[in-house]
């Protein structure tokens, strides 16, 4: 029996976002006090992200007959990430050249106050590529879970799952136990997800109440350019990849609409990570591929962040009337391919990454970041939305490459017959 429309989660989230915007606009002081509602919801989701990634990856790897598959899946995923990330970086650069959102500002760099962005610049210089790689190794297993470090948890899960696969039947009891824990954790996620409208309301009310719609007006062209470019990336680049793989990007976006609305309301792609993993399994992707690709993608496949980086750098150059040579722009692309990974998992990662990228183009002052500091919060929603769609598509593609994509399940899920697919997935 079909639910009444007002009981459907995505309808509730849309309503909550609208109410949050209204409250933030008309009663900003009250709206700012709603921040704990959004923060609380994100914390509830984050408390199960680590255990879910661990259990999903462990059971997926433990069930593999060929351990070479782990390396093969990881290699294919990283290759895909690098190619698509490069496309996102180039598209951001091209769109800014064509639409020129920074032209006409005529800002003198000497008049900019860089104190507000100094902390981001310090963090950018504080973490090298070696530091990033060393950070993947946790001090202790417990510390990785306590800090919620996704890549550290992934490393532990890879080792744990590999040992269970090597033990075979002797490790079956442990594997079955972890599989049972996985079902319990997803049950918790289902309960917490019912609170998504409250979290979306609190986060959106706070954003509008604190920053105000008026703060958007001077930089509307940049915001519009970024949103338009992200839509083009999803529909054209990811759309072409999806069509080549055998599914529709429009239907895929419709399939994960609840997760996208949660991300829209909270500005956090992590808030929808557990639900995304579960839905990808129900759509026919193998558990082992989902467990490896999705968590890794959250650090290495940030398509929205990549578009933002090259666009923001070129916008600052245009606004301050600084001409970049083609060689400088190619250098910018090369460095951005590295920095977009190096600052992942750090608070304020988008701005830290931008600071690290600007550091290699000395003709553009770091203080120029202050031009977009005020609107960064409004652009973060689009970054997060693009990131989550990109990671979802990546998982389906790698599953198809591994010939572990159940296309019948995928067609059923994307055509709206998700109930049957979900029931079958639950039995498996």
UniProtKB/Swiss-Prot annotation:
- Choose one Gene Ontology CC annotation of this protein and give it: plasma membrane
Q: What compartments host this protein?
A: Cell inner membrane
Keywords assigned: Cell inner membrane, Cell membrane, Membrane, Symport, Transmembrane, Transmembrane helix, Transport
Coiled coil located at which positions? Answer: none
What GO terms are given for molecular function?
Answer: fumarate transmembrane transporter activity; malate:proton symporter activity; succinate transmembrane transporter activity
Main subcellular localisation: membrane
GO terms for biological process, alphabetical: L-aspartate transmembrane transport
Indicate whether Plastid appears among the record's keywords. no
What Pfam families has UniProt attached to this entry? Answer: SDF (PF00375)
Q: Which domain of life is it from?
A: Bacteria
Membrane-spanning intervals of the chain: 8-28, 44-64, 78-98, 148-168, 184-204, 222-242, 307-327, 355-375
Bilayer topology annotation: Multi-pass membrane protein
Read off the HAMAP family from this record: C4_dicarb_transport
Q: Which family does it belong to?
A: Belongs to the dicarboxylate/amino acid:cation symporter (DAACS) (TC 2.A.23) family.
Q: What does this protein do?
A: Responsible for the transport of dicarboxylates such as succinate, fumarate, and malate from the periplasm across the membrane.
The name this protein carries in UniProt is: C4-dicarboxylate transport protein
**Name of the gene:** dctA
């Amino acid at each position: 029996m079909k639910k009444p429309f007002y009981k459907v989660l995505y309808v509730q989230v849309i309503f909550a976002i609208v109410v949050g915007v209204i409250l933030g606009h008309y009663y900003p002081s009250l709206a700012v006090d709603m921040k704990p509602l959004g923060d609380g919801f994100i914390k509830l989701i984050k408390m199960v992200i680590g255990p879910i990634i661990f259990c999903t990856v462990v059971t997926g790897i433990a069930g593999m007959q060929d351990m070479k598959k782990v390396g093969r899946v990881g290699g294919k995923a990283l290759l895909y990430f690098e190619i698509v990330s490069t496309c996102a970086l180039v598209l951001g650069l091209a769109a800014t050249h064509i639409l020129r959102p920074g032209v006409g500002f005529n800002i003198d760099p000497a008049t900019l106050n860089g104190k507000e962005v100094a902390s981001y610049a310090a963090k950018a210089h504080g973490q090298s590529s070696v530091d990033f790689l060393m950070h993947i190794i946790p001090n202790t297993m417990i510390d990785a879970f306590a800090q919620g470090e996704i890549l550290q948890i992934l490393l532990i899960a890879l080792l744990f799952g590999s040992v269970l696969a090597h033990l075979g039947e002797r490790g079956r009891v442990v594997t079955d136990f972890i599989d049972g824990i996985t079902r319990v954790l997803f049950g918790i996620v289902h309960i917490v997800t019912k609170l998504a409208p409250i979290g979306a309301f609190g986060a959106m009310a706070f954003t509008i109440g604190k920053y105000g719609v008026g703060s958007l007006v001077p930089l509307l062209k940049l915001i519009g350019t970024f949103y338009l470019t992200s839509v083009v990336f999803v529909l054209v680049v990811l759309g072409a990849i999806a069509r080549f793989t055998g599914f529709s990007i429009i239907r895929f976006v419709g399939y994960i609409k609840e997760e996208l609305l949660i991300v829209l309301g909270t500005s956090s792609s992590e808030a929808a990570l557990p639900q995304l993993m579960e839905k990808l399994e129900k759509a026919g992707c193998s558990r082992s591929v989902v467990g490896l690709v999705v968590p890794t993608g959250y650090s290495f496949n940030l398509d929205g962040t990549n578009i933002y980086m090259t666009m923001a750098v070129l916008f600052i150059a245009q606004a301050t009337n600084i001409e970049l040579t083609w060689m400088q722009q190619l250098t910018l692309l090369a460095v951005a391919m590295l920095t977009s990974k190096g600052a992942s998992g750090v608070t304020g990662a988008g701005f830290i990454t931008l600071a690290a990228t600007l550091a290699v183009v000395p003709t553009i002052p770091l203080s120029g970041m202050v031009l977009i500091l005020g609107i960064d919060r409004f652009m973060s929603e689009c970054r997060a939305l693009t990131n989550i769609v990109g990671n979802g598509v990546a998982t389906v593609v790698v599953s198809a490459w591994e010939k572990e994509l159940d296309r019948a399940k995928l067609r059923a899920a994307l055509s709206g017959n998700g109930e049957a697919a979900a029931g079958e997935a639950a039995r498996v």
